[in-house]
Amino acid sequence: MPLENYGPSGACLHEVIGADSPLLDVACQLFLKIFPEDHRYVPYVRACAQQRHPSHPNTFDHVWLVQQNDEWVGLRVFSYIVTREFGHGAYIGLLDNARGKGLGSWLVKQTLEQLNLDARQFGRSASIGYLVEVERAIDARSEADRLADERRLQFHRQCGGIILPVPFMEPVMIEGVSYIDSAALKDESPRPMHLMLIPSSTGAQRANLDIVDLVHGLYLDVYRLKEDHEFVRNALSSFVGDHI
């Protein structure tokens, strides 16, 4: 569990562990409320609750619920990439009535603390932070979507997020998973996204960031793409061997 279980306004974190957890259905139902457009990805949340699912060989996964005033109000899904020194933030979301109370930034802080614990568990001294894919406002289909995308980007920036200077395409799903049939995702398409690093205190002190390692960690180890995949090649076309 995170180092701090209680947060602003009486919020409390609960970790969902195991396919038989009584909280797993709660997490999936809340996921559908917060991210209705991603309903096809509920099996991914269920897989992450197992922490070391066979379809996620390179990650140690976490599913957290946020409870406030006896109501489930927030969800966090993220992973430590065991082959690297950083993690991947898949989902962070709150119900409308729980926003604007500091819960989002508190969840980010707890995520960074947990990733440090995970890093030590897997033989490293600390995590440098985690990667997150953020929608680009320029691609929004409506004014409401554009404003929502701008708010998400601003939130991650306020949490110290750095936009990495790479053209990033978000794959539809992790390659070769056993829990989602490709037919279920036939209407989904890869999306151009901002790729951001939310640095930990250790990561913020790094003089340089290894772009190749960060991109490889997400594309090769999380999404399980091949190194010669077009997404990988395009992202690194200007950065092979470079740091920032």
Residue ranges and their predicted role:
Residues 1-51, 59, 65:
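Short amphipathic alpha-helix that is part of the acyltransferase structural core
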Residues 65, 70-80, 88-93:
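Conserved beta-strand in the GNAT
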Residues 82, 96-98, 138:
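Feature marks short, surface-exposed loop/turn motifs that line or immediately flank catalytic pockets
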Residues 94, 100-119:
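Conserved acetyl-CoA-binding loop-helix of GNAT-fold acetyltransferases
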